[in-house]
Amino acid sequence: MLELNFSQTLGNHCLTINETLPANGITAIFGVSGAGKTSLINAISGLTRPQKGRIVLNGRVLNDAEKGICLTPEKRRVGYVFQDARLFPHYKVRGNLRYGMAKSMVDQFDKLVALLGIEPLLDRLPGSLSGGEKQRVAIGRALLTAPELLLLDEPLASLDIPRKRELLPYLQRLTREINIPMLYVSHSLDEILHLADRVMVLENGQVKAFGALEEVWGSSVMNPWLPKEQQSSILKVTVLEHHPHYAMTALALGDQHLWVNKLDEPLQAALRIRIQASDVSLVLQPPQQTSIRNVLRAKVVNSYDDNGQVEVELEVGGKTLWARISPWARDELAIKPGLWLYAQIKSVSITA
């Protein structure tokens, strides 16, 4: 568990945090440049010192301004991966990985190297590596110090699109197989969608929202970052069954289910899906014959006029689903809070 209750002056703003983060999964730190994202993780790592408050990791006090406690970075057991890999140029990859390696991680070296796909790189110098390869080595080096927490400061920011696509699957594997909580600084919605369990949104040094990805994603706080034509819903689902005759997989959403193209996932596997509001249409009665495989019973929570369109907030199995319809359709269907209807979903994408 990471307890953050501190403040630190940042130019004309003051970074003020009072949140408790669980000791698992990935928490994305999101916001525009200058919001305080990097300043937050620098304070946690010990690179900077808050003027007030406390930072406590798993019961260990890292910083207590009132008591004059401020552990040095090397005593905090916090790993840090920077935007630029910062590898030692005169050490081969193997030497970089072993630099600062904890004794408890010696037996984990081969496993971690395999997990990050860097075994072919062990005898190469950093100067011969691509940007994505360097970042994988940097992540491996940080993990081999046996940290209780891993901080990643926009690790994909300096990479071009092909290198980002190369590194993203390795980060996804880490989230599944390495039981170390991570704080992931980013201003990329795509990275957050694929990696984060939780999101903390910062603005001018203040926390505007903090919670599960699907909750924050559907809140008004995210509206400035979401293009209107890309309004969408993020939902947690589990694998229910694989169709015996067709290459389709059913995903449980409350007491209903969605069909998607067949997934190579075991039953009960937890997944996250994204549904674009523009891919959801509404009907008052379930259609008798339709090519659309996914028709869910839903209740209208509210509706909002938006530049000639209507955003309809629906509840499905205790979760929020958004639909975008025209004012004409809203009036013809008499859309109002509490109305039960059916949502036809034309497309579903798997995010994690």
From Swiss-Prot:
Has UniProt tagged this entry with the keyword DNA damage?
no
Q: What is its main location?
A: membrane
Keywords from the UniProt entry: ATP-binding, Cell inner membrane, Cell membrane, Membrane, Molybdenum, Nucleotide-binding, Translocase, Transport
- MF (Gene Ontology): ABC-type molybdate transporter activity; ATP binding; ATP hydrolysis activity
| Signal peptide extent | none
Question: Quick check: keyword Signal in the entry?
Answer: no
What exactly does this protein do?
A: Part of the ABC transporter complex ModABC involved in molybdenum import. Responsible for energy coupling to the transport system.
Q: Please report the name of this protein according to its UniProt entry.
A: Molybdenum import ATP-binding protein ModC
What are the top taxonomic ranks of the organism? Answer: Bacteria, Pseudomonadati, Pseudomonadota, Gammaproteobacteria, Enterobacterales
Gene this chain is encoded by: modC
